[in-house]
UniProtKB/Swiss-Prot annotation:
Miscellaneous field: The primary structure of this cryptide Pep-4 is identical to that of cryptide Pep-4 from Tityus serrulatus (AC P85840).
Source organism, top-level taxon: Eukaryota
Signal peptide range in chain numbering: none
GO cellular component, one term: extracellular region
Arginine amide: modified positions: R11
The organism of origin for this protein: Tityus obscurus (Amazonian scorpion)
Keywords attached to this entry: Amidation, Cytolysis, Secreted
Protein's UniProt name: Cryptide Pep-4
Amino acid sequence: NIALGQDQSGR
């Protein structure tokens, strides 16, 4: 989740 930050926020 936070570790990625890509798929979630897309930023």
